[in-house]
């Protein structure tokens, strides 16, 4: 039986705190609600500390070019001030951010919320998989490293728990049929992205019985018409995109950026059939927010830029777990664990 806990965070602020309520679901059906939860405590320093870390982290891209020849980065706007960061600066900023987040999660209110969640799930088996969904429209809360919370870190609480983000949830996930249909979309490889290796990872799934359509054909550039037609005509279980993105824009080729809103009608037609969308690109929260309106059950995005090698390794580890029949959120958790073993400043951005 699939269990979910939805932590609904209402409008608030880091200065005053955030109202919160809980919903418990089993097999897509709400079985309990908890509306009298303690309010999340204030954390007025978090936006500043996060922005400082993010500026240093993205500025580190020039250094990582030596080790990782391609970096899925957010494009700099004209007139924007940028700085080249050192690895030490990034490590220090990461420690400051981690300390801020751990101190926040260490406040008694989070212990009280944990107790209510554990109390509601006390009849579950110790190794039962539980999906904990954080439902918020606040950008900073979406980017916060929720896996620092004891609810996820302490194995004696929910050892098989995995957090997810979303702004809407209605449609329970249907089990994927044995022969799944995958649309693999490959955008711009500007900056030296090794999209050919992403393509090989996806197309290798045919050995598990998946039916894969890749666009564009090898050696060609993606066009908006090809993208629209493929989304419109297909009956896809999984949509996969690899390339660059920023906000709600994907980079079709070196000279063309395409607003995902131009694909609205094609998405409206086929999104009800889609079980999973994966965007192996930087700055994916804008795309995730847009696609949430189409009620796709599962979206995997990068919350911040990551080196291309790391994005590809995450994809590899995730697909290895997922194709063995493990639940999606369990596959994401295991892939994250693999990635955290790579000694980079911080990779809690997927």
Enumerate the language-model features and the residues they cover.
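Caspase-like cysteine protease fold
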Residues: 148, 153-173, 249, 256-272, ...
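A general structural motif
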Residues: 127-131, 177-179, 235-236, 272-274
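Non-catalytic, solvent-exposed interaction/assembly segments
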Residues: 1-146, 152-154
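Extended hydrophobic secondary-structure segments that form protein cores and membrane-embedded regions
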Residues: 130-136, 216, 278-280
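A domain-level signal for caspase-like cysteine endopeptidase catalytic cores
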Residues: 137, 171-257, 290
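Active-site proximal helix-loop segment of RNase H-like, two-metal nucleases, encompassing DDE(D)
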Residues: 314-326
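Catalytic cores of nucleophile-dependent amide-cleaving enzymes
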Residues: 162-165, 238-317
């Amino acid at each position: 039986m699939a269990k979910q806990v939805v932590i609904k965070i209402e409008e608030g602020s880091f200065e005053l705190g955030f109202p919160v309520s809980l919903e418990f679901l089993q097999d897509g059906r709400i079985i309990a609600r908890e509306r009298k939860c303690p309010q999340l405590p204030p954390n007025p320093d978090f936006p500043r500390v996060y922005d400082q870390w993010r500026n240093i982290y993205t500025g580190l891209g020039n250094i990582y070019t030596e080790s990782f020849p391609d970096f899925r980065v957010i494009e700099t706007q004209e007139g924007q001030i940028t700085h080249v960061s050192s690895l030490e600066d990034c490590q220090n900023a990461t420690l400051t951010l981690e300390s801020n987040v751990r101190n926040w999660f260490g406040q008694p209110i989070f212990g009280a919320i944990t107790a209510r969640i554990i109390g509601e799930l006390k009849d579950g088996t110790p190794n039962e998989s539980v999906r904990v969904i954080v439902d918020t429209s606040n950008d900073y809360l979406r980017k916060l490293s929720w896996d620092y919370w004891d609810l996820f870190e302490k194995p004696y609480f929910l050892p098989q728990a995995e957090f997810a983000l979303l702004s809407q949830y209605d449609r329970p996930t249907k089990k994927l049929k044995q022969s799944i249909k995958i649309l693999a979309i490959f955008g711009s490889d500007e900056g030296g992205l090794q999209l050919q290796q992403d393509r090989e990872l996806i197309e290798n799934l045919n050995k598990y019985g998946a039916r894969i359509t890749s666009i564009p054909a090898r050696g060609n550039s993606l066009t908006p018409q090809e993208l629209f037609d493929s989304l419109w005509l297909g009956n896809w279980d999984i949509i996969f995109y690899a390339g660059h993105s920023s906000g709600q824009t994907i980079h079709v080729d070196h000279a063309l950026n395409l607003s995902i809103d131009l694909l609205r009608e094609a998405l409206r037609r086929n999104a009800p059939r889609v079980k999973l969308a994966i965007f192996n690109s930087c700055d994916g929260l804008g795309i995730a927010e847009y696609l949430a309106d189409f009620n796709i059950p599962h979206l995997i995005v990068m919350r911040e830029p990551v080196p291309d090698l790391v994005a590809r390794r995450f994809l590899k580890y995730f697909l290895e777990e997922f194709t063995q029949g493990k639940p999606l959120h369990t596959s994401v958790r295991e892939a994250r664990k693999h990635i955290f073993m790579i000694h980079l400043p911080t990779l809690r951005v997927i």
